[in-house]
Design a protein with these regions (language model features):
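Beta-hairpin (beta-strand-turn-beta-strand) motif
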Residues: 86-87, 222
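Acidic, metal-ligating active-site segments
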Residues: 89-140
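Alpha-helix boundary/interfacial micro-motifs
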Residues: 102-104, 185, 237-238, 278
């Protein structure tokens, strides 16, 4: 139990520390703003340095002038927004059975069309040993692998929604009764339970097909899966391939996709300014700083974040310059390499990410920005579609209890003996202290 009286004694020290940090942040902000102005004057040379030299930190490449400020256009009256989010029940050896549950929230919101929305979730229980322990061959814990599989499921379901809502281009569309898995390389990546769920979802989603209107696919968080960098190549492929296949389907359906990051802590754009502050003629982190980039002389504004700087530069409804991320994992993304910009959505500065194919087509790019901004306005500071997808996906404490109660009933009906939780779990639930 938390002793608040003891915590209160530490509050004064915390408040004094935060006050000093706020003053220091203003100094860093002034330095960053000055470097931004200087870098704009030498932007072509700095971009060339970024492209030709190996740096010890991730610096995004600006593909527009650094002083770009663009007012985002109004969203069309008739449009559709789709979103997915996921949640799970973690596996535990202390429960009555070692299994886990993935729950993917699905949202389709139609505006100006007189159509009902889709708000539901698709649960899946993973219990077969070949699914539970497949990741152990790569030294990955089941609990960790479960999170990766949730990411895959979110992307696959988002692709299905985009195809069903907007239709697939290039003669690859499916009939109303057909399985959405065909021809996209997903079959080998899905468990048996996932196949049956996909077939059910195909029948449900067939009711959504109508004449197309501008449509946006939204996902919560980054499109850059940094965690993949540390995984063995076979595990990385098993996760990334179905995700990119789903993004291919969105591209063919001409449904732009964005990754929306609220309160982003990234400094990838600011790191480009470190090229300007580098005291050496040619940036070579290994040669001049022995690879120790955190304390390098070019790091003059840490720990300032991108959104802090752009909050001083953008007006509500404006976006900043477009950047191309330099994350190493993006070398595996092909035509889905990730770009991003910062958008003043009114309540905050959001980082909005796009696959390369969205940026390359102006209509898709403009649609993505205008519908994203509209979603934030409708959600009073956060995209309403993402908030609803989260609400559909979240597994609360009561849901967890009912899930295991249902599982216990089925195990007893199957004639299993000694069904129950471990003594440790039972003791934690029924404390008498």
């Amino acid at each position: 139990m938390l002793d608040l009286s003891k915590i209160a004694q530490q509050m004064q020290g915390i408040s004094q520390h935060l006050a000093k940090e706020a003053e220091a942040a203003q100094v860093r902000l002034a330095i960053a703003a000055q470097l931004l102005h200087q870098a704009r004057l030498q932007q072509p040379q700095l971009v060339e340095q970024l492209q030709t030299h190996q740096l010890g930190f991730a610096a995004a490449e600006p593909v527009e002038p650094l002083d770009t400020r663009v007012s985002i256009g109004a969203a069309p009256e008739a449009h559709t927004v789709i979103a997915t989010d996921g949640s799970q029940i973690n596996p535990s050896h202390h429960e009555i059975a070692y299994c886990y549950l993935l729950n993917i929230g699905r949202v389709v919101l139609h505006y100006g069309q007189g159509r009902f929305p889709l708000l539901d979730s698709q649960p899946e229980v993973i219990y077969r040993p070949e699914d539970l322990y497949a990741s152990r061959q790569w030294g990955i814990r089941t609990e960790e692998w479960m999170g990766y599989q949730r990411t895959v499921s979110e992307a696959v379901v988002l692709g299905e929604l985009g195809v069903e809502v907007n239709g697939e281009k290039g003669g690859r569309g499916k009939g109303k009764g057909e399985n959405l898995e065909g021809g996209h390389g997903l079959t080998g990546q899905l468990s048996k339970g996932q196949h049956s769920l996909r077939n059910k979802k195909s029948r449900q989603l067939s009711l959504l097909q109508r004449p197309t209107v501008p449509t946006l696919a939204m996902t919560d968080g980054s499109l850059i899966y940094w965690f993949l960098e540390q995984l063995p190549a076979p595990a990385r492929e098993q996760i990334l391939e179905p995700i990119l296949a789903s993004w291919d389907r969105l591209r063919e359906a001409q449904v732009p996709m964005v990754g929306y990051l609220s309160a982003s802590r990234s400094s990838e754009a600011l790191n480009f300014l470190r090229l300007q502050s580098c005291p050496h003629e040619q940036p070579d982190c290994q040669k001049h700083c022995e690879g120790q980039t955190d304390g390098a002389p070019c790091q003059v504004f840490s720990p300032l974040r991108d959104v802090t700087l752009w909050a001083t530069l953008l007006e509500p409804g404006q976006r900043g310059p477009l950047f191309k991320s330099s994350a190493d994992i993006l070398q595996l993304y092909g035509e889905h390499r990730v770009y991003f910009c910062h958008v003043h959505v009114g309540a905050e500065i959001a980082r909005v990410e796009f696959p390369e194919w969205v940026v390359q087509e102006q209509t898709l790019f403009d649609t993505a920005l205008s519908l994203t901004l509209m979603q934030v306005q409708k959600g009073f500071g956060y995209p309403v579609s993402l908030a609803e997808a989260h609400n559909q996906a979240v597994v609360r404490g009561g849901d967890r209890s009912r899930f295991f109660a249902l599982l216990e009933q089925q195990m007893i009906r199957a004639g299993l003996q000694n069904v129950g939780t471990s003594y440790k779990e039972a003791r934690k639930r029924d404390s008498i202290a």
